[in-house]
């Protein structure tokens, strides 16, 4: 059996930076209680290891309000502005491990909304990154994930301006399709493609590998937006695409008759 491993397999820059930030805080502040607001990344194995080292995951804003000491680390996906404001008001020390590319979107959304733009976020409304982005809007914001939602989108006034941004891990081709639908409405619109270049390149590489192999294995956490999209992309190119999280999930019987296998791992 011939195996082809994606060259860019593994954590992206923003995820690796966030993981390193947590371990650095553990090492440098061993006497302090370390918290992360939400799972620092979508990787169950990494989260378990951090918990063994004493890191506690805070899952709600109500829990966060009870924290009076220690260090809170903001997850790689970012948080709404109100969370940063809450930490400042309570005098809680925190470290912002938001991916720099996501942080850039926060700045864009805050600035454009203050200048009167209606913000359109193309992405998954259930994903913490999108929730965080929406939380930096100073005015109206709409999340669009499907073609139906794009067609249904309407401004209250035609004099409104629109600024479109995207979840960094959104499928690039879907983004283009949704932007085209919104653009047909002839609004005063600016479109900022904020999909991470690394995401786009990894999606293209995964698709190219999947096209030329007999079976494709996508490795990653089931909650990871990147992994879900890579599985979808690979499945479109290779019918025998498998989604696993650990080695124990791999059924070798499914691969006995194949000659070439592609492997793509991703986390976010």
Task: Say what each PLM segment does.
Residues 2-138, 142-157, 172, 177-183, ...:
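Active-site loop-to-helix "anion-binding N-cap" substructures in soluble metabolic enzymes
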Residues 60-61, 98, 123, 190-193, ...:
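A short glycine-rich beta-strand->turn/loop micro-motif centered on a GG-aromatic cluster
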Residues 68-69, 211-212, 257:
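Alpha-helix C-terminal capping/helix-to-coil transition sites in glycosyltransferase folds
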Residues 143-148, 168-175, 193-204, 222-223, ...:
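A general structural motif
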Residues 182-215, 220-221, 228-243:
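Active-site rim loops that border cofactor/substrate pockets in soluble metabolic enzymes
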Residues 261-263:
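Phosphate-binding loop/pocket of nucleotide- and phosphate-handling active sites
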Residues 267-268:
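Conserved small/polar residues in nucleotide/adenosyl-binding loops
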């Amino acid at each position: 059996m011939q195996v082809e491993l994606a060259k860019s397999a593994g954590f992206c820059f923003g995820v690796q930076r966030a993981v390193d930030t947590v371990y650095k805080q553990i090492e440098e502040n061993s006497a302090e209680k370390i918290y992360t607001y939400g799972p620092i990344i979508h990787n169950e194995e990494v989260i378990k290891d951090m918990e063994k080292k004493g890191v506690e995951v805070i899952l709600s804003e109500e829990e966060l309000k009870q924290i009076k000491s220690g260090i809170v680390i903001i997850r790689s996906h970012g948080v709404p502005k109100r969370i940063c404001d809450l930490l400042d008001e309570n005098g809680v020390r925190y470290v912002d491990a938001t991916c720099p590319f996501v942080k850039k979107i926060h700045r864009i959304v805050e600035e454009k909304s203050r200048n009167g733009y209606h913000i359109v976020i193309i992405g998954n409304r259930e994903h913490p990154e999108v929730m965080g982005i929406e939380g930096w809007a100073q005015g109206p914001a709409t999340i669009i994930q499907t073609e139906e939602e794009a067609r249904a989108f309407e401004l209250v006034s035609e004099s409104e301006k629109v600024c479109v941004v995207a979840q960094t891990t959104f499928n690039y081709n879907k983004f283009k399709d949704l932007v085209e639908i919104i653009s047909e409405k002839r609004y005063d619109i600016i479109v900022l493609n904020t999909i991470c270049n690394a995401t786009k390149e990894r999606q293209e590489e995964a698709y190219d590998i999947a096209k030329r192999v007999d079976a494709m294995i996508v490795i990653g956490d089931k909650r990871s937006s990147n992994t879900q999209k890579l599985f979808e992309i690979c499945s479109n190119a290779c019918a025998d695409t498998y989604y696993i999280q650990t080695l124990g999930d791999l059924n070798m019987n499914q691969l006995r008759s194949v000659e070439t296998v592609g492997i793509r791992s991703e986390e976010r």
